[in-house]
Swiss-Prot record:
The RxLR-dEER motif acts to carry the protein into the host cell cytoplasm through binding to cell surface phosphatidylinositol-3-phosphate. Belongs to the RxLR effector family. This is RxLR effector protein PexRD20. It is found in: Secreted; Host cytoplasm; Host nucleus; Host nucleus, Host nucleolus. Induction: Expression is induced during host plant infection. Residues 1-23 form the signal peptide. Keywords: Host cytoplasm, Host nucleus, Secreted, Signal, Virulence. One of its GO terms (cellular component) is extracellular region.
Length: 240
């Protein structure tokens, strides 16, 4: 319980890590790299905690300004279906007795009722909080769950629309969409998805250029794929 504020800080950073990005291929790659970095969130959390005499984990004490910012962030969110303490209990059970699966928590938070508005839903932060406590790669786990629930293509188009087509959407929400689409692109890369496969999936051809509303997914992923491949020494396919 004493690591409560620090865990919330990790979740806040985890969900808002792309706030300084802009909607370009380089920014999308930056978000993809941020996703890879966030895979170590849980390990970083553990490295900043130590056991008390009663076996509790005592977190690194953040500065007052951090605590105040964290409180403000939590107060701006609407009421959660599952309070933080309940999430902590469920995470503890999941790690010790395997009684609270991420699928069950996802459903209890009513995140299985459609993608519309999900990025601004405070219960998505609660689900991320649960994953930070239970998963080694929480951002990867979250995007994987969204994809398994709603479909890879549906999630990709939804995030792309928020980034580029949505009206009256805050920059913060667009930044979160960029972060999660970056996570999706990393997932594609790790699973061996080539730009050629994405081009085929989204029916991108010269005759459809500037007419296909989702050809940008292909162009974004092509840039991300090339740069990730160059960093990993993975050979580029003959046709990307």
């Amino acid at each position: 319980m004493r690591c409560h504020y620090f865990v919330l800080l990790a979740v806040a950073a985890f969900l808002a890590g792309a706030n300084v990005a802009v909607a370009t291929t380089d920014a999308q790659l930056s978000d993809a790299r941020a996703v890879r970095a966030s895979f170590n969130t849980k390990r970083a959390l553990r490295s900043h905690t130590k056991a008390t005499d009663h076996g509790e984990e005592r977190a690194y004490k953040p500065s007052l300004s951090v605590v105040e910012s964290l409180n403000n962030w939590m107060q701006r969110a609407s009421k959660n279906i599952l309070p933080d303490d309940v999430i902590l209990v469920m995470a503890s059970k999941a790690m010790t007795k395997k009684t609270s699966s991420s699928d069950a928590v996802f459903a209890m938070l009513q995140l299985d009722q459609g993608l519309k508005g999900i990025l601004s839903n405070p219960n998505l932060k609660q689900f991320a909080y649960y994953l930070v406590l239970t998963e080694k790669a929480p951002s990867q786990a979250l995007i994987t769950k969204l994809i398994s629930q709603y479909g890879d293509d549906v999630v990709a188009k939804y995030l792309f629309d928020i980034k580029h087509k949505a009206i009256n959407v805050s920059e913060k929400l667009k930044a979160e969409a960029r972060f999660w689409q970056g996570a999706q692109y990393v997932k594609w890369f790790d699973e061996g998805v080539t730009p050629a496969l994405v081009r085929q999936k989204y029916n991108v051809h010269p005759e459809t250029w500037y007419k296909n509303p989702y050809e940008g997914v292909y162009w974004e992923y092509t840039g991300v794929y090339a740069k990730l491949a160059s960093k990993s020494n993975k050979p580029l396919p003959v046709e990307v």
